[in-house]
Amino acid sequence: MNTNDFDFELPEELIAQTPLEKRDSSKLLIIDHRQKTMVDSHFDHIIDQLNPGDALVMNNTRVLPARLYGEKPDTHGHVELLLLKNTQGDQWEVLAKPAKRLKVGSQVNFGDGRLKATIIDELEHGGRIVEFSYDGIFLEVLESLGEMPLPPYIHEKLEDAERYQTVYAKENGSAAAPTAGLHFTTDLLKKIEAKGVHLVYLTLHVGLGTFRPVSVDNLDEHDMHSEFYSLSEEAAQTLRDVKQAGGRVVAVGTTSIRTLETIGSKFQGDIQADSGWTNIFIKPGYQFKVVDAFSTNFHLPKSTLVMLVSAFAGRDFVLEAYRHAIDEKYRFFSFGDAMFVN
């Protein structure tokens, strides 16, 4: 298939710049790809789409305040680093601006020297490997100096950084939020659990590759970014029990889908505890092995995320649903509305 097969016109005013006051007051488009039906609803009604005995699978990653502003001690030149992933120990892969000033051996100071970064390797496209030095605990230093790395299409200042975290965010490590989970409130999750739905958590640390457009025409030539994932034995056992009892595995967001399908592909459809790096690219033609239904936000044109949704529900029907969402003025992207796919 061709990248342009997943293109659509999106009015800029539909790109949500701020979150709604209430997380679960966003709109929800419920689609059934077998019945070819679409129903306009609101997110707090997602509970009606879940059955007793189902498992609702959520990504409990927490977004790091990963954007750092510092200066070179020799020239006092301003430098911006965006943390992408922890490679080992105190070493991180980062995106640097301006990258051309930062050669191997260069040093950058943050917060009057409370945090220092030394460049130890140069990568393409402005990437660098840095080693940090600091006193105390790295995450505490980062919390005091870093800023939340909002997506490039959000231009408004975020008043409350916690609104770019899910209410169940726990495991530090993401450069972006698993945005399908932003709609859930603690109260809504309690109601879902009281209905007899199993709440299951996994971890996938979201990288900035999630915003990277597909730059090739032929999808088979696309180089998918890799992200770290983890599923515990307790979570895996719950999911196996749910499947065996005839319940559904309902994923919250594309990151949960990618984790579950990575594991399903690795273990021939079985669900096992596992951790590692995944670069799975789910596109039309892929046979789903674990996920039975899911919720997700509305994604960028020509993105791998639109392709993933199309792999499950069919490209033509998904694009028809997107046209409906645009006509009905649904809000798009990270702070936007949601879709439930049966």
Curated annotation (Swiss-Prot):
Keywords (A to Z) from UniProt: Cytoplasm, Queuosine biosynthesis, S-adenosyl-L-methionine, Transferase
Top-level taxon of origin: Bacteria
Cross-referenced InterPro entries: QueA, QueA_dom1, QueA_dom2, QueA_sf
SUPFAM superfamilies: QueA-like
Subcellular location: Cytoplasm
GO BP field: queuosine biosynthetic process; tRNA wobble guanine modification
HAMAP family: QueA (MF_00113)
Family: Belongs to the QueA family.
Protein name per Swiss-Prot or TrEMBL: S-adenosylmethionine:tRNA ribosyltransferase-isomerase
Encoding gene, per UniProt annotation: queA
